Amino acid sequence: MFSRQTIRKPDSSIIKDQIKTKIKMNLNIPIQDKIPKYKFNIRQYATQVNKDMAVILVYFNFVKSNRILQNLYTVKSLLDNAQIPYFITELAFSSDEFVFNPQPNIFQFKTDSYMFYKENLIFCAEKLIPESYDKICLMDADILFDNPEWYTVISQQLNEYNIVQPFKKAHWLQFDFSIQMLKENVVDELSSDVINYGLEHPGFAWAFTRNVFNDLDFFDKSIISSAGDAILTFKITSKMDRHTNDSVIKFYETQFKTKFKVNSTHEFSSCDLNIYHLYHGSLGNRQYVSIHDVVSNYLSRRNIKLIDMVERREDNLLEWKPKFKNDMNIMMLNYFTLRKDDE
């Protein structure tokens, strides 16, 4: 184990400048003339009787964004009122308090590492959810449906298909609930082998039968930014991510010395549902591409790979090894800060 003095602390101002430069990337978002002009109205969900599907939400908020927490409270309240079974995996930094009081459906972890923990927390949660739920729905904690019966629609579709991307159209909302952007799912149009980020969205929500989810060998190490959705899409549909010159799929294959495989034995589908993404800052500030480039440069200069920098705890949570924790924490905390989710 290295002492703290042996870790070379990178200049945080340089890292910030790198990220701010990369933020000007091409988001590949076309001008859309047919975006609906109405404002989204939140609707209560239908109370559920058949509860065979567990909804998984994750929450980590290292910079204490009010809007991210407010969005989670909105989603949680709707699920509570409809008695929809859900599980929240909450992660807090070691010096911070948890937001939620202990509950059977809230799994809580603490860490002293800054990572993009979404996929890792999903992986941790699935291991803890009772086996009585034979279906799961992975859902971002800022997603709403306009159909009160969405839970039943998804669950019934999972009776026919093992994998479901549970929407036809995804809408990005402004802070006033007007619609900023509109995209399709990635599973209905398979004529291309590339994810068309201008028209398609690989994220927000996926649903699975429980046994098939485990059979997919879910990759939970996309710890730099939200690349897990692209990796999952490739495993399901064989659609490649070419959002950047250096695909994030190739990035993680290289960094973790693995090869993602398409699971062609399971049928997949979508649902005739609309989903709506609650606002938390400008889309340009997400920096999904920029942070990968910054970290790639760091790794190249040191001739090291992520697989050598990460360790897994007994409870399945990933953390930086002590030797690299200082450097990576500086980079990742700067990334989370520069996202400006409360703007």
Name what the model sees in each region.
Residues 145-238:
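Conserved catalytic core of nucleotide-sugar-dependent glycosyltransferases
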Residues 50-54, 76-89, 104-105, 134:
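Short loop->beta transition adjacent to catalytic acidic/histidine clusters or analogous donor-positioning motifs
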Residues 98-101, 150-151, 175-180, 281-283, ...:
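Short aromatic-enriched loop/helix-cap "lid" or pocket-rim segments at secondary-structure transitions
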Residues 90-133:
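Active-site-proximal specificity loops/subdomain of glycosyltransferases
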Residues 2-53, 61-75, 222-343:
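C-terminal catalytic/acceptor-binding lobe
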Residues 89, 164-169, 271, 278:
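Short glycine/serine/threonine-enriched helix-capping/active-site loop
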Residues 133-144:
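Short beta-strand-to-loop acidic/aromatic patch adjacent to the donor-nucleotide binding site
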